[in-house]
Amino acid sequence: MERHGVQHLVSFASHPSEAPVLAECMELANGRLSSLSVVDPRAEGAPERVRRLLDLGFSGVLLFPAMHGYRPDGPELADVLDVLEEDGAVALVHCGLLEVRLRDHFGIPRNYDLSLANPLHLILAADDHPRTHFVIPHFGAGMFRETLMAGTQCSNLYVDTSSSNSWIRTQTRALRLADVFERALGVFGSRRILFGTDSSVFPRGWRHDILVAQREALGACGLDGRGKNDILHGNAARLLGLEPRTDAPATTPTIESGTGRS
């Protein structure tokens, strides 16, 4: 983190057994690490588990509707969202294309129902839970138009910029990364976009190339310094309850996948 000028990062527990380890890491990180945990809301005792996670200092949950087989606005998730609402916590909801490389490495089939991962399914859930911060990673991972539509409807819905955004190849109209940022800014403004790289485990580590590409895209959009600071730092700091910085840094609290073991 020091070498790359990263002030704060977010990691996630991809299995319940990892949560205590991450809780200990947060204690040792002197306030520079926040954590989310993957939660399957269909699992027995899921709401109680979320309550324990929040009490341990977790900032919220990471949800995979396509992987676990439910709609975000369905009854399976309602009780979990009610717990998040109590604390105004974060629900990072993976929508669109889903690729988990470790699962691919072990030959686990990609039997994901992408119809369940439509950002439009978040609208009713977000409306019913106005204190919960819903974040769609990767600009919707191919469901970009739907992400923009959902963001237009819901003021508590955010988007993150993480990964190489290779989903752009799936769009019927050619898009540059700068085009993606420009359209996202038109809907979400600079206050509801969160920078991220989706950096993962070593040996790859920190994705400096993604930071460079996204800085260039923001520059091409003509965004002013305050807007850049919102995206690269301030918005994540606000959602995570961190102390805001006033020096408009060029580096950020990053939305990361820390374990990469979903």
Give the residues covered by each predicted segment.
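Conserved, mostly hydrophobic/aromatic
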Residues: 1, 53, 61, 84, ...
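Mid-to-C-terminal alpha-helical segments outside catalytic/metal-binding sites
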Residues: 1-8, 183, 187-194, 203-262
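Short, surface-exposed connector motifs at secondary-structure boundaries
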Residues: 3-8, 30-32, 127-134
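Active-site gating/metal-coordination segments in enzymes
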Residues: 7-8, 15-104, 111-113
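Short beta-strand segments
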Residues: 10-13, 38, 135-137, 160, ...
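Acidic-and-aromatic substrate-binding clefts and catalytic sites of carbohydrate-active enzymes
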Residues: 11-20, 40-46, 68-73, 140-144, ...
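Short hydrophobic/aromatic-enriched beta-strand-loop microsegments
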Residues: 33-38, 157-162, 248-249
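Catalytic pocket-lining loop regions of alpha/beta-barrel enzymes
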Residues: 60, 74-194
